[in-house]
């Protein structure tokens, strides 16, 4: 079933399940970029505070089950299968005709309920107002990350329209944290939405770089100014971290969360597929990044170009895209003279048959105007052959364009997530 935004099916499904979402406290996170990192910072910090915590993120990386984590582990096959069967049975019995994403989301809530989770960190799937995750009457906190143009067919063609949709997670008397470096028109819309919903207090989160690499200085209402060190790479992590730390500071008024819990949690955070450098046998280091829109490409380019200056290397880009992406715009940001592009596709996505991979030839044609780069298609090559070809062309290899492509790569290469 294709994407069908709306809450009626989801609310009916949850009602017939006994409303499992009412059994835990929810931290809701919406936005275009950075949601997953923010989720992970909060999740690992809550675990450091010995709070039984769940996390729900999407899309899945290797399999649908990995969208659901409980107390530091991906949901076990036993609990996932049990809860999935319960959800499917209820959906069939009451003919709610829920979408795949709604079924998976309900399964996550059912897993959290049966596991006795106290706090669940919930990433919005798309948008906010009509997303299947937006079923909490009174979450403990709402967070909005960086907002950019993406999914315009569903959310609107302007940043203001998209911001309004994402602000649909705001609830009366529930505090909200917003990435303070969003564009002014976005911040104005979010403030207006918060006022209309009577969501308050309204916090703008901002971080600044510290003395050392991957070190950030963040000021929060209760803890004041502190320094945090993260293993996650990229300048944009400063803002993701600022949102997470501000959120945790606010949560500390209701839960036993101390500053050292957060500092240790941040140090131990991992998030696969985002500036993720992995050592692959016989191929050496490969950088995997899920950048699939222009803003994410800009951040990836910043990181890659800093490495280019240091090592004076051209890059081999292994890319695949869903069939609605602006390949020309994204690759124009990434490519430099002497680079190589190998266009491929990703396999069918479990539970999401409407997600289609762009044909490699279409990708090639979209960037053929970049005459200073070589471009190949890899229709009939295995993943090993694709990566070997990329390595032969340039010692620096980057895989990007789609998390679904990264999922294929991680499965094939048996990389940990």
Swiss-Prot record:
The protein in question is named: Probable dihydrofolate synthetase
Q: Which residues bind Mg(2+) 1?
A: 58, 123
Q: Does the keyword Phosphoprotein apply?
A: no
Q: EC number(s) in its UniProt entry?
A: 6.3.2.12
- Has the keyword Ligase been applied to this entry? yes
UniProt binding sites for Mg(2+) 2: 151
Q: Which Gene3D superfamilies match?
A: Mur ligase, C-terminal domain (3.90.190.20), Mur-like, catalytic domain (3.40.1190.10)
The organism named in the record is Schizosaccharomyces pombe (strain 972 / ATCC 24843)
Provide the function of this protein: Glutamate-adding enzyme which catalyzes the binding of the first glutamyl side chain to dihydropteroate. Leads to the de nove synthesis of tetrahydrofolate. de novo.
């Amino acid at each position: 079933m294709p994407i069908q935004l709306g809450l009626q099916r989801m609310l009916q499904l949850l009602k017939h399940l006994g409303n499992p979402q009412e059994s835990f406290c929810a931290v809701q996170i919406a936005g275009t970029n950075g949601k997953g990192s923010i989720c992970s910072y909060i999740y690992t910090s809550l675990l450091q505070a010995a709070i039984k915590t769940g996390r729900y993120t999407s899309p899945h990386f290797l399999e649908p089950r990995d969208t659901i984590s409980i107390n530091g582990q991906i949901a076990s096959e036993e609990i996932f299968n049990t809860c999935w069967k319960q959800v499917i049975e209820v959906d069939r019995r009451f003919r709610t005709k829920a979408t795949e994403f709604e079924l998976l989301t309900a399964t996550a809530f059912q897993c959290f309920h049966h596991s006795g989770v106290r706090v669940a960190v919930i990433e919005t799937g798309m948008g906010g107002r009509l997303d299947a995750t937006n079923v909490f009457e009174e979450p403990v906190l709402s967070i909005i990350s960086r907002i950019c143009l993406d999914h315009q067919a569903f959310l609107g063609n302007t940043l203001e329209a998209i911001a309004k949709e994402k602000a649909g997670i705001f609830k009366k008397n529930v505090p909200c944290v917003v990435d303070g470096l969003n564009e002014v028109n976005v911040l104005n819309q979010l403030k207006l939405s918060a006022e209309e919903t009577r969501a308050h207090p309204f916090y703008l989160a901002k971080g600044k770089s510290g003395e050392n690499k991957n070190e950030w200085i963040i000021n929060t209402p209760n803890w004041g100014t502190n320094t945090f060190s993260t293993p996650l790479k990229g300048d944009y992590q400063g803002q993701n971290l600022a949102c997470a730390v501000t959120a945790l500071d606010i949560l500390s008024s209701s839960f036993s969360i101390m500053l050292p819990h957060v500092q240790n949690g941040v140090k131990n955070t991992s998030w696969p597929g985002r500036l993720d450098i992995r050592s692959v046998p016989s191929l050496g280091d490969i950088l995997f990044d899920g950048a699939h829109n222009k803003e994410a490409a800009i951040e990836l380019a910043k990181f890659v170009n800093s490495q280019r200056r240091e090592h004076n290397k051209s890059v081999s880009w292994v890319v695949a895209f869903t069939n609605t992406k602006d390949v020309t715009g994204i690759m124009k940001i990434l490519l430099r003279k002497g680079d190589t592009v190998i266009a491929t596709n990703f396999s069918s996505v479990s539970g999401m048959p409407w997600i289609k991979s762009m044909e490699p030839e279409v990708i090639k044609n979209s960037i053929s105007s970049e005459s200073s780069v070589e471009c190949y298609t890899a229709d009939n090559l295995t993943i090993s052959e694709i990566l070997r070809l990329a390595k032969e062309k340039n010692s620096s290899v980057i895989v990007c364009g789609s998390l679904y492509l990264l999922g294929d790569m991680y499965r094939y290469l048996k990389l940990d997530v």
